[in-house]
């Protein structure tokens, strides 16, 4: 297991984890530029390929067990190779499987929502050839966000956020945030309180840095107070702002036939100024087998 993932999981055992963890700056991927390069036209910023993916936890019940789904997910992720993936529902062993399947260039940051390695993670995977983490934090969607495993709003499950501040090694070491979450499936009250807490935390981020929010929000875009709160926090929906879009499907399918034009409950949001070139809902399946009960959503971005 790569060292950074081990460090992340070891730190996740500490109750003080809600305090942001600063990581040492690595000089990997940096090189001195010739003096002449400073006089050249600035390079166009490379696109950042992002994904939000509810993995469906590693269940053992067929016909959609993790053992059956894993090779399909491996094929999908290797084919798409996003630079950053905000995941939901992954269990510890499952995340190690995905890390192996993505290959040696990927790492992840996360902690179990019940604390340590217990229960589901909001793990953020990233391509180390493109991104280096600078700082990360976990907090819980409750009245006591610094307490691992806390759940005070009557939600059906513990809910949390993992966020990471990255350096983009291909874009002049530019920094940006990724915030990843999974809101409650049972309680609208818990979802609304969670969205309000996320909005407050986002307001505390450096306003000069781009922000990408990934998540399963368990409500339809455009038709819920949760969506209004997130956009009221100064975010925009990449599905709406993208220059090009794929076909719309309900992003939760539950292994049933896909629903064209259905509810989009998995979103990728950004601060204004970031350009969304393309947004898509990925319908990949192999011989009728989907990798999850959700469809991953993707956005190709230029941070701004």
Each model region followed by its residue ranges:
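Structured beta-strand-rich core segments of catalytic domains in phosphoester-bond hydrolases
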Residues: 84, 88-175
């Amino acid at each position: 297991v790569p060292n950074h993932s081990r460090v992340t999981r070891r730190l996740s055992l500490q109750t003080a984890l809600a305090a942001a963890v600063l990581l040492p700056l690595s000089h990997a991927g940096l090189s001195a530029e010739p003096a002449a390069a400073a006089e050249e036209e600035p390079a166009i910023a490379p696109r950042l390929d992002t994904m939000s993916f509810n993995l469906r936890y590693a269940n053992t019940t067929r016909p959609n067990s993790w053992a059956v789904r894993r090779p399909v997910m491996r094929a999908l992720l290797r084919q798409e190779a996003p630079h950053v993936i905000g995941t939901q529902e992954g269990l510890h062993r499952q995340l190690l499987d995905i890390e192996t399947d993505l290959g040696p260039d990927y790492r992840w940051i996360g902690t179990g929502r019940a604390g340590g390695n217990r229960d589901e993670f909001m793990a953020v995977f990233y391509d180390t050839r493109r991104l280096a983490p600078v700082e990360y934090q976990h907090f819980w969607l409750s009245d006591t966000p610094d307490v691992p495993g806390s759940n005070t709003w009557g939600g059906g499950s513990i809910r949390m956020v993992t966020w990471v501040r990255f350096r983009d090694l291909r874009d002049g070491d530019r920094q940006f945030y990724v915030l990843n979450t999974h809101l409650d499936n049972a309680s609208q009250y818990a979802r609304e309180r969670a969205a309000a807490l996320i909005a407050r935390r986002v307001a505390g981020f450096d306003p000069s840095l781009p922000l990408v929010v990934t998540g399963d929000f368990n409500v339809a875009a455009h038709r819920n107070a949760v969506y209004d709160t997130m956009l009221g926090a100064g975010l925009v929906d990449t599905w709406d702002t993208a220059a090009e879009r794929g076909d719309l499907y309900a992003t939760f399918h539950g292994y049933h036939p896909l629903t064209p034009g259905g509810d989009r409950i998995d979103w990728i949001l950004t601060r204004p100024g970031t350009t969304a070139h393309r947004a898509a809902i990925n319908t990949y399946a192999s011989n009728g087998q989907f990798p999850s009960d959700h469809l991953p959503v993707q956005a190709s971005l230029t941070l701004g």
